[in-house]
């Protein structure tokens, strides 16, 4: 029996509708939440992602603006831009699109973003707020994972959760969010002994390692909920066959585009899991939806939640 598909597109649309209603209420009180996106140079993938963010802002009624310094920009000039956005009262959220060019000190730039406008949730102050369960801005993808669980009525309290991957952007924050929700959490990584055995203990398994199809059915407890955070592009025909042999729909898309996306979980995991997020269309759509939610949250937190 195949797993229940947890539809990220549907949940993302629900969240955007809720955000739009919240923005309309704020506008009636004279406040329009504002998001500034900084995109350095012309990275095609980043440009697509930023276009999607701008489109989401238009859908939800959030004011947005783009700043596009050249890829020759210096750290000092980029700092000056970030600091000017920090000072503006009409901007509630600042997002610096990564990666930045090699000559730019990325860490210095991200630390320069005011914590109250850090809608990516990467600033150490927001990380501290998350770890101490205080109101702050939470990284978008982990927050989206929690929304999938909540809106799909997956029990978290008392559940055994295993997070494969310990990145600052996904692995560590989702582990903290699950802990805060009273799950019993194990974080796994490249040095974990007998990874499949550890994963098989999980009622909730989160794969966030950036390795295509690494989590195979033998990693999964029957009936577990699996959140696949990975988005990996495959262009090699032999690798495609490993994951999607016999899948006519994927085959047609691969033949047309010369590539396809696969998560960190092998598609056959869906034959063992009880519920499963597909790639694409699972966790991915939630990232931008939660960015919109974070922008509204920042607008409220900056004003002491009095709006």
UniProtKB/Swiss-Prot annotation:
Catalytic reactions of this protein: (6R)-5,10-methylene-5,6,7,8-tetrahydrofolate + NADP(+) = (6R)-5,10-methenyltetrahydrofolate + NADPH; (6R)-5,10-methenyltetrahydrofolate + H2O = (6R)-10-formyltetrahydrofolate + H(+)
Keyword Endoplasmic reticulum: no
GO BP of this protein: L-histidine biosynthetic process; methionine biosynthetic process; purine nucleotide biosynthetic process; tetrahydrofolate interconversion
A GO cellular component annotation in the UniProt record: cytosol
Keyword NADP set for record: yes
Disulfide bonds: none
UniProt-annotated binding residues for NADP(+): 165-167, 190, 231
UniProt pathway: One-carbon metabolism; tetrahydrofolate interconversion
InterPro entries according to UniProt: Aminoacid_DH-like_N_sf, NAD(P)-bd_dom_sf, THF_DH/CycHdrlase, THF_DH/CycHdrlase_cat_dom, THF_DH/CycHdrlase_NAD-bd_dom
Keyword list, A-Z: Amino-acid biosynthesis, Histidine biosynthesis, Hydrolase, Methionine biosynthesis, Multifunctional enzyme, NADP, One-carbon metabolism, Oxidoreductase, Purine biosynthesis
E.C. designation(s): 1.5.1.5, 3.5.4.9
Gene Ontology molecular function, alphabetical: methenyltetrahydrofolate cyclohydrolase activity; methylenetetrahydrofolate dehydrogenase (NADP+) activity
Functional note: Catalyzes the oxidation of 5,10-methylenetetrahydrofolate to 5,10-methenyltetrahydrofolate and then the hydrolysis of 5,10-methenyltetrahydrofolate to 10-formyltetrahydrofolate.
Family per similarity comment: Belongs to the tetrahydrofolate dehydrogenase/cyclohydrolase family.
Quaternary structure and interacting proteins, as annotated: Homodimer.
Protein name: Bifunctional protein FolD
Protein's organism: Koribacter versatilis (strain Ellin345)
Lineage: Bacteria, Pseudomonadati, Acidobacteriota, Terriglobia, Terriglobales
Primary gene name: folD
């Amino acid at each position: 029996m195949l797993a229940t598909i947890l539809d990220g597109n549907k949940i993302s649309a629900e969240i955007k509708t809720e955000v739009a209603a919240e923005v309309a209420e704020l506008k009636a009180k004279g406040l329009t939440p504002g998001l500034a996106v900084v995109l350095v140079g012309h990275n095609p993938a980043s440009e697509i992602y930023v276009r999607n963010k701008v489109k989401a802002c238009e859908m939800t009624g959030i004011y947005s603006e783009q700043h596009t310094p050249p890829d020759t920009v210096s750290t000092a000039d980029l700092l000056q831009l970030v600091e000017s956005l920090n000072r503006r009262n009409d901007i509630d959220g600042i997002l610096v699109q990564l990666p930045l060019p090699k000559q730019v000190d990325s860490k210095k730039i991200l630390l320069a973003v005011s914590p109250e406008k850090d809608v990516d949730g990467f600033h150490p102050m927001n990380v501290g707020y998350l770890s101490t369960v205080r109101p702050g801005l939470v990284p978008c993808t982990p927050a989206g994972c929690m929304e999938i669980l909540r809106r799909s009525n997956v029990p978290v309290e008392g559940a055994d959760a295993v997070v494969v991957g310990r990145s600052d952007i996904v692995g560590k924050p989702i582990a903290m969010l699950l802990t805060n929700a009273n799950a019993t959490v194990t974080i796994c990584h490249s040095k974990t002994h007998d990874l499949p055995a550890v994963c098989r203990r999980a009622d909730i398994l989160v794969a966030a390692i950036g390795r295509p199809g690494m989590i195979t059915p033998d990693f999964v407890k029957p009936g577990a909920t699996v959140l696949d955070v990975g988005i990996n592009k495959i262009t090699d025909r032999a690798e495609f066959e490993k994951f999607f042999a016999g899948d006519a729909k994927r085959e047609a898309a691969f033949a047309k585009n010369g590539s396809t996306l696969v998560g960190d979980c092998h598609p056959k995991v869906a034959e063992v899991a009880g519920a499963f997020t597909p790639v694409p269309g699972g966790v991915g759509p939630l990232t931008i939806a939660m960015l919109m939610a974070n922008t509204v949250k920042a607008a409220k937190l900056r004003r002491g939640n009095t709006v």
